[in-house]
């Protein structure tokens, strides 16, 4: 008999953190779960940790594959998952014991397609409020929708959610970007959903890595990472323009004050050739942003954004040099 909930966990070189995530899944108040572990070619002790867990808890199973990236690992796990509901967890994070019970119970009561909950940042053993989500999850709202509550444009991560599996399959949802893969899929799902439940309860602890390899989001200024971030911005924006264009101004403002800001900052330590792809992608994105949204940005900052988008990185650095320390 299929489990009520399947949780897909991609694994790649997370030996210091994987036991904590697996312990948190094993301790879930919702016990009727299937945990699909996908070892994406780990070269550390992660595979051995996963195999040991599978041997001791029949709810866990392991798929092993050559390294193909997070999107491919999630998609592989989803194909094996059989639960009526679907969730994703990253192998270096922690899921509070009550999380999946609350999210699934809410969906069963409301009939919504997605349930989403609040997030905290985990540093060592300290749990911090995540400023970006403070307002978004301040109150519980059932059977809402992104087109009626545009604050959900900021709810772009996949791991603080449970999806109704029939909804996921009906729309053929899958991950396709090699990095920053959450946003296009999550925003697409938000728009396609009949309704969404938003819980003020904390359902996920997102770790800041201090051991092992840094996470993708911790490598802000590496050229390949900068380009990957901008590709996410463009792909997500294109989905919004196609399916819910009335949300694009909110999305564009959020990007300009967040991901685009970090992209432009990368001009301080990288050359024009290294950032060529990122410049092209930012240029493409700016072409979709309404002038009224651009006018809301401080003029000096907008000038730096346009220099980056034009590939004029030397001039951008000169602008940074003029700024006070």
Q: Residue spans of the language-model regions?
A:
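Nucleotide-sugar donor-binding/catalytic module of glycosyltransferases
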Residues: 1-238, 242
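C-terminal subregions of glycosyltransferases and related glycan-biosynthesis enzymes
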Residues: 208-325
């Amino acid at each position: 008999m299929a489990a009520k909930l399947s949780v897909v966990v991609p694994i790649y070189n997370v030996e210091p953190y994987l036991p904590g995530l697996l312990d948190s899944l094993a301790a879930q108040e919702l016990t009727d779960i299937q945990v699909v572990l996908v070892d994406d070619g780990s070269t550390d002790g992660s595979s051995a940790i996963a195999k040991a867990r599978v041997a001791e808890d029949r709810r866990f199973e392991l798929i092993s594959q050559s390294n193909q990236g997070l999107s491919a690992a999630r998609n592989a796990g989803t194909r094996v998952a059989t639960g009526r509901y679907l969730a994703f967890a990253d192998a270096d994070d922690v899921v509070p014991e009550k999380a999946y019970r609350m999210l699934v119970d809410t969906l069963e009561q409301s009939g919504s397609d997605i349930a989403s909950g609040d997030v905290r940042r985990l540093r060592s053993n300290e749990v911090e409020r995540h400023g970006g989500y403070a307002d978004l999850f301040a109150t519980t709202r059932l059977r809402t929708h992104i087109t009626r509550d545009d604050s959900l444009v900021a709810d772009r991560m996949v791991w603080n959610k449970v999806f109704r599996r029939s909804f996921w399959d009906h729309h053929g949802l899958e991950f396709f970007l090699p990095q920053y893969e959450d946003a296009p899929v999550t925003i697409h799902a938000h728009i396609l959903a009949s309704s969404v439940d938003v819980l003020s309860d904390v359902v996920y602890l997102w770790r800041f890595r201090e051991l092992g390899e840094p996470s993708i989001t911790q490598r802000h200024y590496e050229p390949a990472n900068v380009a990957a971030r901008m590709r996410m911005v463009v792909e997500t924006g294109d989905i919004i323009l196609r399916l819910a264009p009335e949300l694009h101004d909110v999305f564009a403002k959020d990007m300009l004050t967040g991901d685009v800001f970090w992209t432009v900052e990368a001009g301080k330590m990288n050359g024009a050739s290294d950032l060529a792809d990122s410049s092209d992608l930012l240029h493409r994105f700016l072409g979709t942003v309404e002038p009224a949204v651009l006018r809301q940005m401080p003029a000096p900052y907008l000038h730096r954004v346009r220099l980056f988008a034009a590939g004029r990185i030397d001039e951008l650095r000169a602008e940074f040099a003029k700024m006070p320390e």
